[in-house]
Amino acid sequence: IHNLWLHPLAKFPGPKLRGAFYFPAYYEIAKGDVVYKQHELHERFGDIVRIAPNTLSIIKPEAWKDVYGQGHKAPMPKCPEFYWRGASVAADIIAADDSDHTRIRRLLNYAFSEQALKSQEQIINSYITLLISQLSKQASAGSAVDVMAYLNFATFDITGDLSFDESFGALEAETHNQWVATLFSMLRAGAIIRILAAYGVPTEKIFEYIPVLARARDAHDDYTKEKAGRRLEKKTDRKDFISYVLKYNDERGMTHDEIKATSGTLILAGSETSATFLSGAVYYLLKNPDWMRKLQEEIRTTFTTESEITFASVSKLKMLHAIIMETFRIYPPVPAALPRISPKSGVIVAGTYVPAGIKIGIPQYCAYRSSRHFLNPEKYAPERFLGDPKYVEDKRSVIQPFSVGPRNCIGQNLAWAEIRTILARLVWNFDMQLQDVSRNWEKGQTSFVLWSKPSLMVKLHKRNVVA
């Protein structure tokens, strides 16, 4: 009764059952279909919906600066049960509180700057070349290939090298090592951990009650510490992430334990999201062959050799940019909300007062597929980013795949360079055919913060072109 009629959120729209009880929301989190259910609620109830007794979901474009940016004076802290830490007590860039985050980010900004990216281009391109080589072998064999798996191999190898000065060897072996496989299993386990933590179960108790989770967590932490520790002992001029941290480190900088903890976070955040995006881009292009032909024409007429495809040159391609933006819209790599807590003073979010202590977040999947924001939201239509007057009323400012504010994605420069270049070189090298088994690849994917994806089976045909 209190939750329905006396709670500070009682006036907000949403189903009565959700206003009274937590279990509908937590059940969806456990199942992995939370973004689909929330999308239905937003279509029914509007831009602000009460999805649980103490939780609001909001999809207004102007909410980004209020929830995640600096649209108000009072800070919006991260929801603690969502951003639980592993066994390490050291801060990492995602789970750190605001003061630790500012200190850590100050150093990592050097590692992810445009200048650093230029020095890392050769390293990154070497892995893209290996990706193309391995896919070319598959094309010659004439069998269909799981493109999603190879994109994962490439992005993990790139991020591993840039983090530890060591590749994971996934592209060479054409399989992930056990540590990366453990990372994927921890994503789903994280949903259960967050639910139990929300009900007041301490994180360490959760691991105590579920030993298999504790073993996976400890294996992840141990492997990260070993890799990062080996890198910290190296004397090298190679321009990886840690080289910049060490160069600019001081008494206000990062401890070695914090470097190790943050390295593990960067591996997952910098690899899985890019691979997910690229898989989505390939899928939607193959489902919409007219757009694939337009992209092929742009890339294959702009460049005369593959060596001309560089970070700088691909950044100027208008068709490629439109396709990337539409892919972000229809298939965001991070579809679910990353919740914050409203401050003690309460806060105005997109013109609406939110009381103190309320969980609030913006689910990208719901915001980007809203019929209030986009014409034909379920249609893959890159022309909405090419000036088509039909889509002039689209609220494109709601699309923020890297978030906003002081805690936005620090690796977005790298991500942009990586996805542009990999996609351009794939289209330069191969004609592709989506296999029937993957005809509805996006349907029914579950989400545990990131997407849980099936194989993306594609037949590749190598073009006979100059390298």
Model-derived regions, located:
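Cytochrome P450 I-helix active-site segment
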Residues: L17, E121-N125, T175-S185, K239-F241, ...
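Cytochrome P450 heme-thiolate monooxygenase catalytic core
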Residues: M76-R85, K118-L278, K294
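Cytochrome P450 heme-binding "Cys pocket" and the immediately downstream C-terminal segment
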Residues: P289-W291, Q412-L450
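N-terminal membrane-proximal hinge/A-helix region immediately C-terminal to the signal-anchor transmembrane segment
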Residues: I1-R103, K118, N125-Q134, A154, ...
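C-terminal helix/juxtamembrane-tail motif
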Residues: W451-A467
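Conserved cytochrome P450 K-helix/beta-meander segment immediately N-terminal to the heme-binding cysteine loop
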Residues: P343-K344, I362-K390
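Cytochrome P450 heme-thiolate "Cys pocket" and heme-binding signature region
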Residues: A90, G264, A269, E308-S315, ...
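Short, small-residue alpha-helix embedded
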Residues: T273-L286, I422
